[in-house]
Amino acid sequence: MEVFDAQSHYYPSDAMSLDELAYWIAFNRVSGIGPVSFKSLLDYYHNDLEAAWRADSKELAQAGLTQKTIENVMKLRTTSTPQRELEKLERLRIRVITLKDMTYPPLLREIDDAPPVLYTYGKLTEADQFALAVVGTRNSTTYGRQVTERIVTDLAKGQVTIVSGLALGIDTIAHTAALDAGGRTIGVLACGLDIIYPPTNRGLARRMVESGQGVLITEYPLGVQPDGGNFPARNRIIAGLSLGVLVAEAPAKSGALITAGFALKQGREVFGIPGSILSNKSSGVNKLIQDGARPVMEVTDILEALNLFMIPQHVEMQAVLPDNDDERVLLKLISHEPCHIDELIRESGLATTIVSSTLTMMELKGMIKHVGGMQYVLAR
């Protein structure tokens, strides 16, 4: 297992019971089930995936699954149980976020093929809605490294979250520069969270999580290897999590251009850092700019285009303003002295599930802190 022993608190789904979540996880493990077929199952079974799990082959075919996928469902049923996989994720402190959860990344939710299930290690925060993807070649030049470090450092200091794919080259430089500048960064994997790829970036992945500055995200279950076909799908998530995509350095056939293509399809901004016309490493990004991508000479070119000058003020306001009555009730009960969740349930009169999910949201927003032992305090 490559998952690290970070000091992270495990949160179940904020929108469903653990039993229900287990069946979402189970179907997400079935080879052949993607966002479209997953939605077909939800529609056919009216969100009751436990019923789908117990259905026979004929009924699953009526729900829209192919014969091969149905065979994969039947095979998985004989080798594992939904509850067993959920227990494994809990032991590893991996959080599962579904499309039904309030904490599902809002920008990613907007895309047509949003993954129904996300596996995360580390913590997403309210500030991560202000994110920019930074992508490029795995074989970067000195120029590519220098300009990426410069732009990302300035973005991170402006509290822009940096999203990339944890690959070698530009991805590694982007993640590292964000961390060095004290900023946040999200690494999107094309494999399960128990398999850090490439292996040489295990230290970087560990640093992202253990520093509290980053989070690892994937749509792939534990054990899934980084097969070639997974990377384009991974790239759509990189773009989907972001307000825009910056291509730092890329040759004509770079995978970074696939990410830029997803961004355009998703209605997001695309930026490029101009490179030498004599360098093959910049031919892809130069063509991208020629075709209409915004050229970036300095960080203000990005901040102005995305209106990101006021991030600190916006995050501060979001962190202290309750969004609903449940948050208002709990905010009145929580002080700078630790308060146990049982006391909050008793004093608020709210249901246990409501208190649990609301506390999760309040912590993600930076309103409160979990201090261990199911106790909470105000964050400020």
What would you call each of these model-derived segments?
Residues 2-102, 367, 372-380:
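Short, small/acidic-rich helices and loops at N termini and domain boundaries
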